[in-house]
Design a protein with these regions (language model features):
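N-terminal redox-cofactor-binding region of secreted/periplasmic oxidoreductases
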Residues: 1-100
Length: 100
């Protein structure tokens, strides 16, 4: 049983989990969609000072997310007229800060 469940181990989720656990009575579950990273086993791509290695590694980001960047007009006949663009989101402990 947990007192708090935090979905997303990005910058905000990780900081929130840390602050909540400053009270040892709180039981906190931090969920992240990325690969499991045991303590002391952070992948070299994440630790590297050049973020491109982590950014290009498909384990650390969603590869198929797309989003419309245009407003749908009431005059449009079908949704295929709205172009979709790649939507880059990290899936690693630390979120986008780990791969940018």
């Amino acid at each position: 049983m947990f007192d708090y469940i935090i979905v997303g181990g990005g910058s905000a989720g990780s900081v929130l989990a840390n602050r909540l656990t400053s009270n040892s009575k709180n039981k906190v579950l931090l969920c992240e969609a990325g690969p499991d990273t045991p303590p002391g086993k952070v992948p070299e791509q994440i630790l590297d000072t050049y973020p491109g290695y982590a950014y290009l590694d498909k384990r650390f980001h969603w590869t198929e997310l797309k989003v419309s960047t245009e407003v749908k007009s009431h005059n449009m006949k079908d949704e295929d007229q709205i172009p979709l663009r790649k939507y880059e989101q990290a899936r690693v402990l630390g979120g986008g800060s780990s791969i940018n």
